[in-house]
Amino acid sequence: MKIADIQFPEKPLFLAPMEDVTDPAFRLLCKKFGADMVYTEFISADALIRSVKRTEQKLTIHDEERPVAIQLYGREADAMSEAARIAEEANPEIIDLNFGCPVKKVAGKGAGAGLLRDIPKMLEITTAVVKAVKKPVTVKTRLGWDEDNKVIIDLAEQLQDCGITALAIHGRT
């Protein structure tokens, strides 16, 4: 399997991004035990732009943990593209967009999985980020907002048309 220039084994093991879990120490431990790719905790685009210290610390990457993806979430294309440019300075292999978090404080504000209720905005954000950075951009999302709105088949094609290099699907709504 290959994402952009990154070659992975036939059956790669990816460490999912998890808030308050996938810090540098945990990522290094997972690499030691076989993870082929690791992700940072998800990072708020707005907090990154405001230079919130705790958020900036999430950009720390050690060479031993590579390849690494920095995952961002937000609800506005301008903020997400600016945050992606800032994240790119940390030199990750990939910029990943979180369109799958169902937590109320994220989705309830129209970010994460909340963007599954506004596909045009999700596509606008994705296009803006792809254009803003040189690094490959990937997306994590869900099958749809709820059981009556499973949109992943059409959405996957639309995201590909925006220029993403890979898509991770959390196989539920």
Predicted regions and their residues:
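Glycine-rich, positively charged N-terminal anion/phosphate-binding segment
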Residues: K2-A4, M18-E93
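Nucleotide-sugar donor-binding and catalytic loop/hinge architecture
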Residues: I6-F8
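Alpha-helix initiation/capping motif
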Residues: E19, L115-D118
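Alpha/beta enzyme core
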Residues: K32, D78-A111, I119-T173
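Short, hinge-like loop/turn segments at secondary-structure boundaries
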Residues: T55-L59, A113-L115, L155-E157
